[in-house]
Amino acid sequence: MYNRNIDLKKIRVFIYALVCIVLLGGACMTQEGKNNTQDSTITNMKGAELDTIMNDKAKKEQYLVIDVREKHEYEAGHVRYAINISLNDIKNRLNDIADLKDKNIVVICRSGRRSHAAAEILQKNGFKKLFNADGVSSYSYKSLTKVANVRGKQMQELVNTGNYSVVDAREPADYAASHLKGAISGNADTIAELLPQLPKGKPVLTYCYSGNRSFAVAEKLAAAGYTVINSLDGTNEYLAFELVK
């Protein structure tokens, strides 16, 4: 009887210790999960909200929209001001947006599946404010455009190829002071004067101070049949533009 009581006590102690280990392990796992996500969230965004942001020149500056569809899907029509980094490329192009880890990042695709996968990749790589927007097949966006958008570094690289016409949509005085190589001066109100200076079969690059004035020019050129790429980063934002006199 004495030995049996000793065995029962040992069993109780073992069970108690095992329960404590399980509970402690669960708490640690929960805490670890919180640490991995406490500074980063993925929030669903309604299409109407994104449309509102894209049509507000002040609000749109607070967001970067990334269309993670393939290039041909993006070129067929995309949300205004969205850049294109496909889901298949996003891991290899993290450096292109590494300076924006604290900015509001909106990802979008056709149905929401690829954009959610992209958001998870961004989350794992330190991006903190992520929004997964309704896909273009789920919501009828009013802000769709065929004007492509790139960031300042890529814009400079495109200019350097010499394969594009370039339009500077800043004030004429600022253009006269310095501008991107080969650029001509113009704005949305002088499109009629610009057209004779732009070969029809040659794609056009547009830029300004912040991307707004140049986008207005870009949309009018796109409506006139040109392939247009606009710089989201203007000369006030991307200080590495190679400006010449």
Predicted regions: what they are:
Residues 19-22:
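Hydrophobic membrane-insertion alpha-helices, especially the h-region
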Residues 67:
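Phosphate-rich cofactor/ligand-interacting catalytic cores and adjacent structured alpha/beta frameworks
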Residues 2-12, 16, 26-55, 59-63, ...:
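Rhodanese-like catalytic fold shared by cysteine-dependent sulfurtransferases
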